[in-house]
Amino acid sequence: MNCLTDTHALLWWFTDSPKISPKATNLFDKCEKGEITIFIPSIVVAEALSVFDKKRISFNFKKLFKQINDSENFVLVALDYPILQKMVDLKDIPELHDKIIVSTAMYLNLPIITKDKHLQTLSYIKTIW
């Protein structure tokens, strides 16, 4: 089952954080083995850079970005018109980055790997944690 990741899940997997759930870890492991594809909204990479710049967690951003770029099983998704169209109707999501992530998941019809409690309550998307 292909899916889409949010920033926390991606960074916690990349840094081997104990904060990541077993289900999420399993999905990233399957992606590394080529069994599934994980889609990464461009805002997730931008947020990862912001986390790196602010030194909120320690990791090698260039290594993460290279791994995403070099992998056939991680797919970077640009923010474009169809995704922006979906964002217009998302009045119940206050954070811009979450709107972009949810809109991207809706556009691609994919579940989101996320620990975000607010996103988990939304009836119109599927989340995995």
Show where each model-derived region lies.
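Short, well-structured N-terminal submotif of metal-dependent ribonuclease cores
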Residues: 1-40, 53-67, 122
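Conserved glycosyltransferase catalytic-site signature
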Residues: 7, 42, 81, 98-99
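Donor nucleotide-sugar recognition loop
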Residues: 92-97
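Acidic catalytic patch
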Residues: 16, 42, 46, 65-91
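Residue-level detector of anion-binding/catalytic polar loops
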Residues: 37, 75, 111
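Acidic, PIN/NYN-like endoribonuclease modules and their adjacent C-terminal/linker elements
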Residues: 2, 71, 102-129
